[in-house]
Amino acid sequence: MRNACTRARLTRTARAMVKTLFIAIASVTFFFTSDLALPQSAAAYPFWAQQTYPETPREPTGRIVCANCHLAAKPTEVEVPQSVLPDTVFKAVVKIPYDTSVQQVGADGSKVGLNVGAVLMLPEGFKIAPEDRIPEELKEEIGDVYFQPYGEDKDNIVIVGPLPGEQYQEIVFPVLSPNPANDKNIHFGKYSVHVGGNRGRGQVYPTGEKSNNNLYSAAATGTISKIAKQEGEDGSVKYLVDIKTESGEVVSDTIPAGPELIVSEGQAVTAGDALTNNPNVGGFGQLDAEIVLQDANRVGWLIAFVALVMLAQVMLVLKKKQVEKVQAAEMNF
């Protein structure tokens, strides 16, 4: 009887272990295959930089890490005030221009509209203004944009996106300036602002693999012996390009749906030659700006100084005219 109970417990324990192991394997499999199954989000959204580089999106060289996946260079603009007073709300405008008539390659190879994203690196102490501090007029300019801090303790670094590019080629950030009177770590002076903006999907995943929004090249030198189209159970399409080398070895290049093949069977190619066009129409751009946290007292003293200088000039002019009148009177006498 005791042996039977022991065997029953062992059986239940074994089943539980097998179930746990199965769940663990399924979770790991989903984690590593999600980038392949859903590549569009992996390449297009700024939060991938947040997950891959959790400390800061800016490398020691000054390069913003979004450029590691978005390889093409495109212009990005930013508008910030030259100076701001403490504890005030102002707007920073990031402009991500592009030709809205073009379309990008989607994850399934179809043509879709471009999306945009941005990262705004503000000085320490600056952050997105609370809802109750944003004027109604500024709220209308912002629209339905959601601002996400880069980390729990990184309110001064803000990421936005993905957003539909046709509606958000200009992204308005409502920024609240810090008050040195309340935080001794904040000081008046000039600070740097770093901005990055991308439009369209990236060419490389954070894992280093190419997306289907990229150019594909030959892996070997030889003659293209076969080009075969394959369709997966999920409807995905890919092409296998077989290259036969001089030694008789066959090297296969896998090309996902999206890039257009520019080679044909029987064509001789060299390793590195393009097999497809480059479908990318987007790109990333970054730039730096400066903003001054101005002391209101200094502004007041500056105004007083300017007023004093102007008053002194007026007095000098009046004194000069008075002297001229006296000299003229003496000459007449």
UniProtKB/Swiss-Prot annotation:
> What is a biological process (GO) this protein takes part in?
photosynthesis
Q: Which GO terms describe its cellular component?
A: plasma membrane-derived thylakoid membrane
- Cofactor, free-text remark: Binds 1 heme group covalently.
Q: Which Pfam families match?
A: Apocytochr_F_C, Apocytochr_F_N
PROSITE patterns from the UniProt entry: CYTF (PS51010)
Q: Where in the cell is it found?
A: Cellular thylakoid membrane
Keywords, A to Z? Electron transport, Heme, Iron, Membrane, Metal-binding, Photosynthesis, Signal, Thylakoid, Transmembrane, Transmembrane helix, Transport
Function comment = Component of the cytochrome b6-f complex, which mediates electron transfer between photosystem II (PSII) and photosystem I (PSI), cyclic electron flow around PSI, and state transitions.
Q: Which family does it belong to?
A: Belongs to the cytochrome f family.
NCBIfam families for this protein: PRK02693.1
Put simply, this protein is called: Cytochrome f
